[in-house]
Amino acid sequence: MGKARTTHTFCRICEASCGLVATVEDQRVTALEPDKQHHGTLGFSCMKGLHQHSMYDSPDRLQTPMKRVGDRFEPISWSQALSEIGARVKSLRAVSPQSLGMYVGTAAGFSILHPIFAEGFMQGLGSRNIYSSSTQDCANRFAAAREMYGFPFFQPFVDLDHVECMLIVGTNPVVSKWTFLQVAHPVKRLKQVKHRGGRIIVVDPRYTETAKVAGEHCYIKPNTDVFFFLSFLEEIFSRDAADAPHLQGKASGMDALREVTRHWPADRTAEVTGIPADTLRDLVNTFLAADGAAVVTGTGLGMGKDGTLAQWLAECINAVSGNLDKRGGTLVGEGIFDFAGFARKNGMFMRKARSRIGDFRELNGGFPGGILADEILTPGQDQIKGMFVTGGNPLLTMANADRMREAFKQLELLVVTDIYLNETASLAHYVLPATSPLERPDLPFVFPLFLGMQSIPYLAATEALVKPSGEQRDEASIY
């Protein structure tokens, strides 16, 4: 038995990136505890984060590259796997670079190098066909930001330390932590807002766990957020409460927005949303009276009907009320460098390519995951015939799994990189074993590092805590 040692690291399961103290013995992580001295995450961690090492030690963990032979998988060397995959890729690329596609899952986003090298690999192939899990839950935010601010990663976030009124719409941070903002210990942070006299009002079809903490809940019918926001804006304009000086020289289209909202007074939308007109007016009163207020949204809004329009209207409320880029309102973070300027200079995330199926415009360098099955199954020029799946399990997480399964079975090449032989990998021609987060050095992912989307600013880094248990490789090195 080797001597146990403790070391500091951080979790890479969700955006909170909680600080952890790991106990390591004989090249195994034997325990994970919250880092009570951590500047940013305040000694908090959820149960998933504290028990993740048990999953990485599972006997079902992939140890070597695997190749499908008939109806079973056989272990092969990395040299053989890369050689055979490379030969098939060259054959498909010779017909059309667009015959190759990639699905990038959420797990890729929590490794700083994984998505960079995965996208670089596809650029090297000359293929535009990248699909991601973001189109299922948060693409609306990127689309709204692209149209409103000119860059999809321009994502203002609530100033939790000073906000006096917070409308939480379509998100439940007590359970899901936060979204598009690095916040640990959500219950503690919400209670801090209340203890200093702030009000938190949850607008949701359900009396959520967050509503219980907030103490104030406003019922809304599902998929009617757009009408709620339109009436909210109409109230602001009808009271002549729009903060024009705050937006002077910074915004255009105010008159057009005023005209659109004029047709949706609270009395008209009350029956649609289920929110009485007087209740909505009271919400507007509270919001405008606060010295710092914010509408906060999440995946409930993004996965609902008209999610992009709803997100845009929510951003408009924050801007028109004078709370955009304001203490106590919504802030614009600063990362370690000017990511937006760098991206604009290099044309990142702003290409105007269109999909073969549906003619959808590219967003954040990718197309909607919902058209992936059709891109594979529909014959014609640039039909996808080879796929790489990395950091995700689309057969389990995407809608219409039966059609996705049919599509994957038709592929001439399916390569899956993961830590387990999951549902998607079970259909693959090759499965490549990846390292776990505890087996790689890392920095925080793009939101806190490049965009400064943190409620408490700090910079973290971690070394690999243990060596891989088998022949696993970090995804970035694979691509």
Positions of the model-derived regions?
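N-terminal export/assembly segments and adjacent metallocofactor-ligating motifs
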Residues: 1-239, 276, 390
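Non-catalytic alpha/beta scaffold blocks inside enzyme catalytic domains
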Residues: 37, 139-313, 320-326, 334, ...
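Generic structural signal for short, solvent-exposed loop/turn connectors between secondary structure elements
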Residues: 25-30, 57, 65-74, 94-96, ...
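Active-site-adjacent alpha/beta core region of enzyme catalytic domains
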Residues: 331
